[in-house]
Curated annotation (Swiss-Prot):
Residues 1-57, 113-147, 202-222, 375-705 are cytoplasmic. The keyword Transmembrane helix applies. InterPro entries: cNMP-bd_dom, cNMP-bd_dom_sf, Ion_trans_dom, RmlC-like_jellyroll. It is a multi-pass membrane protein. Putative cyclic nucleotide-gated ion channel. SMART domains: cNMP (SM00100). Signal peptide: none annotated. Keywords: Calmodulin-binding, cAMP, cAMP-binding, Cell membrane, cGMP, cGMP-binding, Ion channel, Ion transport, Ligand-gated ion channel, Membrane, Nucleotide-binding, Transmembrane, Transmembrane helix, Transport. One of its GO terms (cellular component) is plasma membrane. Residues 593-622 form the IQ domain. It is found in: Cell membrane. Residues 79-91, 169-180, 244-353 are extracellular. This is Probable cyclic nucleotide-gated ion channel 16.
Length: 705
């Protein structure tokens, strides 16, 4: 030992200086870590802060795992088939102990955090929400007087101490009855404080966040896990009691053989598999009747009553591999807990009867708790659906009472169905109204800004003006074949299409029979007359009349900007009156586009008529007839003979052309005479309303200033 000490000392003296602690101390990463840990060490934590809230969720999961872990110690004793002996599964014990140490570490961290977590003073709860006590000494005193004892009892590694230190040094009884009784007692004693730690933790989570589970399905799964936990505990207790029942039978039969004239005599040490290769035990096994008298499969033998524990031996549960053994015990606990223990065949033993009564009562309590909580969580997911069904039933009864036509009833049903599919019963306006102004503005900007920017007219505005518009947009839903705006009706809102298509048509074209129709798609808008009305600087409060009829071609989801909101924005932000926005509005307005189209068509037709008149005049100059001073026309026969020198071959063509031009000029002279008498001028006015051409007057220009 001294040589090992000298060797290690010499090796440490010869260590290179690059690995010295001084160099490690000057590491910037190390200094950063130390600064973080020092801040955490000196900081008092807020019980409602993010750190404590997240830790409570993590620790709740750790508590559930620890509650599932502790009953696994009941599966350590095993029975080797056909040998009448018991042993401990050491490998499985090491596995459980490692995870148990990790759980104990989390409980220790929880205790340390509680010494640093502030609390609300009871005297300050009279007015307001209360004040936090940040003094470390007061926090420690309060914790030591309240929950420290329970947390410490849940943290102590009692099962590890019993398995690895107490039981191996228990003398000749370390493989006998004390083994199972002591282990079971320790595990059950510490199982209680660990469960008590979880209850106030659950209440704190609900107090901090409002719910223990964030979703309905996770809440239902949480309650189902608790129910499986109880089944897990019952199954493991049933297993260890089955082992103890088998050991009790062997012990009784062994004592009988010890008192009888039986050679070799039975010894309680033979019931442990550690003496399996003992020659005395092997000789005893050849003549003993312990195995036959304690066989649960022997129906004719009435030496011992196994009662409800007989299935553990008839199905070879005690000698099966761990997973087969565990799932069978879990199924046994789940079956009897759900059936309130009705399938149990208990013996007359008082302990067995008490255990059966406990299973019955526990099944009644926990099964009712499971059904109630799962039903509450699942009802929260279908509550809005049930409300919608009630409203739909009320709507159907109202339509039947009012005797609405089938077409109207179908449209109402379609709208109710579409509104449910779009909103799922959520009142978005009520949710937004309950939020602070700044948060509501940011949410509206996130939801509407990208959609509003898709409207080319609003894309010309700055962010502040767009925020003011987005803040006042409200969702609007319309089903197929719904007339949103009718021509001649007051316009009370502008619609910005998000999804769907609408048809915008007008008959106001300056002549009878005029019709113009366009299709509005996502990114388009309608009701632009309202924008003109909002920008007019007069005191007229009457809403403008629509010049178009807007009808939905499919289900349409849009945002609506009401008249009073648009008027408020126009009055508050004078930038809406800029020439740039005026030109952008005229360019993207469908009303102005329709007017421009008709104006171009009318101008083109006037141009074609003037071109035809000029062509006719040119043909007149090239022809053989002329006009005298009185406006009469003369043919070439009335002209001097010197002008009749053309050949005979052109005479017939000239006569046909002359007849055609004569008819055209006759009609032109007649119209010229009528116009000359009415206006005192021979000029043709293509803009006169008597002309038979389509005409659409330009929309009224707003009085921009």
């Amino acid at each position: 030992m001294s040589n090992l000490h000298l060797y290690t000392s010499a090796r440490f003296r010869n260590f290179p200086t690059t690995f010295s602690l001084r160099h490690h101390h000057n590491d910037p990463n190390n200094q950063r870590r130390r600064s973080i840990f020092s801040k955490l060490r000196d900081k008092t934590l807020d019980p409602g802060g993010d750190l404590i809230t997240r830790w409570n969720h993590i620790f709740l999961i750790t508590c559930l795992l620890a509650l599932f872990l502790d009953p696994l110690y009941f599966y350590l004793p095993i029975v080797q088939a056909g040998t009448a002996c018991m042993s401990i599964d050491v490998r499985f014990g090491i596995f459980v102990t490692c995870f148990r140490n990790l759980a104990d570490l989390s409980f220790l961290i929880h205790i340390l955090l509680k010494f640093k977590t502030a609390f609300v003073s009871k005297s300050s709860r009279v007015f307001g929400r209360g004040e936090l006590v940040m003094d470390r000494r007061e926090i420690a005193i309060r914790y030591l007087k309240s929950e420290f004892v329970i947390d410490l009892a849940a943290t102590l590694p009692l099962p590890q101490i019993m398995i690895w230190f107490v039981i191996p040094n228990a003398g000749e009884f370390r493989y006998a009855a004390h083994q199972n009784h002591t282990l079971s007692l320790i595990v059950l004693i510490q199982y209680v404080p660990r469960f008590l730690v979880m209850l106030p933790l659950n209440r704190r989570i609900i107090k901090a966040t409002g719910v223990a589970a964030k979703t309905a399905w996770s809440g239902a799964a949480y309650n189902l896990i608790l129910y499986l936990l109880v089944s897990h505990v019952l199954g493991s207790v049933w297993y260890v009691l089955s082992i103890q029942r088998q050991h009790e039978c062997w012990r009784r039969e062994c004592i009988k053989e010890m008192n009888a004239t039986h050679s070799p005599s039975c010894s309680l040490l033979f019931l442990d598999c550690g003496s399996l290769h003992d020659p005395g035990r092997q000789a005893w096994m050849r003549i003993t009747r312990v195995l036959s008298n304690c066989d649960a499969r022997n129906d004719d033998d009435q030496h011992f009553q196994f009662g409800m524990f007989g299935d553990a031996f008839t199905n070879d549960v005690t000698s099966s591999p761990f997973f087969d053994k565990y799932f069978y015990c879990l199924w046994w606990g789940l079956r009897n807990l759900s059936s309130y223990g009705q399938s149990l065949a208990a013996s007359t033993l008082s302990s067995e009867t008490i255990f059966s009564c406990f299973i019955c009562v526990a099944g009644l309590v926990f099964f009712s708790h499971l059904i109630g909580n799962v039903q509450n969580y699942l009802q929260s997911t279908t509550a809005r659906l049930d409300e919608w069904r009630v409203r739909r039933r009320d709507t159907e009864e109202w339509m039947r009472h009012r005797q609405l036509p089938d077409e109207l009833q179908e449209r109402v049903r379609r709208f109710v169905q579409y509104k449910w599919l779009t909103t799922r019963g959520v009142d978005e306006e009520a949710i937004l109204r309950a939020l602070p102004l700044d948060l509501r503005r940011q949410i509206q900007r996130h939801l509407c800004l990208a959609l509003v920017r898709r409207v080319p007219f609003f894309a010309q505005m700055d962010d502040q003006l767009l925020d003011a518009i987005c803040e006042r947009l409200v969702p609007s839903l319309n089903t197929k074949d719904t007339y949103v705006i009718r021509e001649g009706d007051p316009v009370n809102e502008m619609l910005f299409i998000i999804r769907g298509q609408m048809e915008s048509s007008t008959t106001d074209g300056g002549r009878s029979g005029f019709f113009n129709s366009i299709t509005l798609r996502p990114g388009d808008f309608c009701g632009e007359e309202l924008l003109t009305w909002a920008l007019v600087p007069n005191i007229n409060h009457n809403l403008p009349l629509s010049t178009r009829t807007v009808r939905t071609l499919s289900e349409v989801e849009a945002f609506a900007l009401r008249a009073e909101d648009l008027k408020f924005v126009a009055n508050q932000f004078r930038r809406l009156h800029s020439k740039k926005l005026q030109h952008a509005f005229r360019y993207y307005s469908h009303q102005w586009r329709a007017w421009g189209t008709c104006f171009i068509q009318a101008a083109w037709r006037r141009y074609m008529k003037r071109k035809l008149a000029m062509e006719l005049a040119r043909q007149e100059e090239e022809d053989d007839y002329f006009y005298d001073d009185d406006g009469d026309y003369q043919f070439e026969e009335d002209m001097p003979e010197s002008n009749n020198n053309n050949g005979d071959e052109n005479s017939s063509n000239n006569q046909n052309l002359s007849a055609t031009i004569l008819a055209s000029k006759f009609a032109a002279n007649t119209k010229r005479g009528v116009l000359g008498n009415q206006r005192g001028s021979t000029r043709i006015d293509p803009d006169h309303p008597t002309l038979k051409m389509p005409k659409m007057f330009k929309p009224e220009d707003p009085g921009f200033f």
